[in-house]
Amino acid sequence: MEASSGTAGPAVLLLILALLLTESQGSRSQGTHTLRYDVTACFLEGSEQTRLLVLIYVDDELFLRYNGDRRSAKPWACWIKGHGGDETCTREAENLPKEEERLREMMADMINQKGHDKGPYTLQATLDCELQRNGSTRGFWHLGYEGRNLLTFDQKTLTWTMDVPFTQQKKTFEPRAPKADLVKTFLDETCPARLQRHLASLSNVLPDTGSPVVIVTCRNYPVGRITLTCRAFNLSSRVATLLWLRDGKPVQQDVFGPGTILPSGDGTYQTWVSIRVLPGQEPQFACNLRHSNRTIMQTAVSGESMGWPSASWATRQEAEGPHRTHNDHVVDGGLVTGNANKDSPDASSCATASAISAFPVVVLSVALPRAN
């Protein structure tokens, strides 16, 4: 998308609507990378100006934020700032005015057709490409109106398809949609090339997170059950396996957790997994973390600390407050807060929580999953 002229007014209203028909991270295979643009344009009644906001994601994590009023993009992830982020932002800012102009024209046609009966109106565009492990690519381009999908580009037929509720408006919107050859070029070539460039940039800004930290806590219940919870912090990528072992063998029964690796917001990742056991069985269980070519084993109950969290993790805890309180079971990274999860552990209600950090740490070359 090349730069073009167009003027956006003062930032009076920026609306961020639900993402349009994007795939969840869990449906993507390991080694797949994605680049997605979520574009929202708002037209205010009685005004000829458009307010535009673009959120740019790499591997489903907010990467850059573009403000159409200022025609500028800013790095969103704090660990990107100061590491080539300005150059990346400038390049992205040069690419977006064309899409802004296209949405403005579509919106003007829509307003004229509806006769200015209400406002504000919003149009959305989602541009998404995937880079597979084997080097193949695929892409998605959706246009939406008022938070509902309006047009979807079919890469097989190279045509735009429209949802049933908007069939009567097809003559208004479809002529303003991007031409098929431009969409195909963007999804097949431009977007994957940008994604590869972003991944290359990110490979140079991986923060020194220190060692992974594994913490095991437990909680007693009056009914005679105990919940053991294993938490892993300071993960340098989403590629990690955390599981419970009983006498050295993996356990699946009575195990629960988020089932995914979650971002901590500082360039690191975290996750947790819990298991319900009977009193006295604790010594039979151990938590196993596999991450960055290392395996960390932590027993369920050791009665004493097995190591120290890394410096960066400890510093973050000191700045953000206690990781765990009686009423706020987990506040770091927002995994579980307050009493939302009745099975969330309270370290004070069972044996002393134990922690282990692995040394030496093996740091990956990028902060995102890389194909083997």
From Swiss-Prot:
Propiece residue ranges: 350-372
- InterPro entries membership: Ig-like_dom (IPR007110), Ig-like_dom_sf (IPR036179), Ig-like_fold (IPR013783), Ig_C1-set (IPR003597), MHC_class-I_related (IPR050208), MHC_I-like_Ag-recog (IPR011161), MHC_I-like_Ag-recog_sf (IPR037055), MHC_I/II-like_Ag-recog (IPR011162)
Instruction: Describe tissue expression.
Output: Ubiquitously expressed in neonatal and adult tissues.
Glycosylation: residue positions: N134, N234, N293
Task: Indicate the transmembrane segments per the record.
Answer: none
Write down the Pfam families for this protein, in alphabetical order.
Answer: C1-set (PF07654), MHC_I (PF00129)
> Lipid attachment points, GPI-anchor amidated serine kind?
S349
Q: Where is this region: Alpha-1?
A: 28-119
A GO CC annotation given for this chain: external side of plasma membrane
The protein in question is named MHC class I-like protein MILL2
The coding gene here is: Mill2
